[in-house]
Amino acid sequence: MALITRRDFMQKTTTAVAAGILLSGEMLRANPLGLPIGCQTWPVRDMIAKDFPGTLKTLAQAGFQSIELCSPVGYADSGFAGLAKYQPAELQRILSDAGVTCISSHFGIEELRANQDASIAWASSIGLKQMIVPSLGGPKNPTMDDVKRAADEYNRMGEKAAKAGIQQGLHNEDFELSTVDGKRTYDVLFGLLDPKLVKFQFQVSTISEGYDAADYFTRYPGRFFSMHVQGWSAKTRKIVPVGQGTLNWQKIFTTAKTGGVKNYFVEMALPMMQASVPYLRKLQVS
């Protein structure tokens, strides 16, 4: 079965799941890693396009304390163009009024190629500390030279971001899930990308293609700073709320500490994100 990408699994998980409960202030912090429960805003992009402040309040009421945005330039056609109308202070006020924080956002690789300086300027102006691309955008069947060129380019981008006090990051979708010379391109990239300039953000749903989060966190200690969280049922091969399905979340979060994960973002259809909060709030890891 093909990898369930962000766009794919959002289309597959729109059936109703019990809505999340409103949580009191003291219940909003997740026990796993002692971090706030975060969510990616991609699943609620249509809501954001209509009402950004209201959407953030909905997420906060569901129990999310932090969010990860998508760039208004690289994701302009996906509902985020409207973010550009806000002055930095106004956007920060909207976040504060909703009761959520934001230090991370996704950016398109083409956006960075076209004008990384402008992207860094926007990120810095709203207080971001992490800039992540979903994929390096290489060919489906790359040669080793293709992979090396992509890594060299992204190392340079990481160096430029670092000068602005921002950590560049790489998600794992599409190109990263290809193979090159009989090896996983993703694994090859760990050897080519500078550990100081580029950190990794793991997409847990890539278990559908055999990419195990706990395995990667263990094999590449300190190379990660984030993860996107989805539940997964091996029986139905479908995305499910966190805590349901077949994933061992204690193992994932325990090894995430080894991997270096500093934040995580639930990313599924809104009802599933809401339904994931109670489990994450109660989950204990050693």
Feature-to-residue mapping (PLM):
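Histidine-acidic metal/acid-base catalytic patches
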Residues: 2-38, 45-65, 124, 180-199, ...
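Flexible loop residues that form catalytic
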Residues: 42, 72, 110, 136, ...
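Flexible, glycine- and charge-enriched loops at secondary-structure boundaries
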Residues: 49-52, 81-84, 88, 140-147, ...
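Glycine-rich, proline-tolerant flexible connector loops at the mouths of alpha/beta enzymes
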Residues: 68-90
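Conserved beta-strand positions
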Residues: 39, 69, 105, 133, ...
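Active-site mouth loops of central-metabolism enzymes
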Residues: 38-50, 104-113
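A short acidic, helix-capping loop that chelates divalent metal ions and anchors anionic groups
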Residues: 74-79, 139-144, 234-239
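Active-site acidic/histidine proton-transfer and metal-coordination neighborhood
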Residues: 13-15, 19-20, 73, 94-199, ...
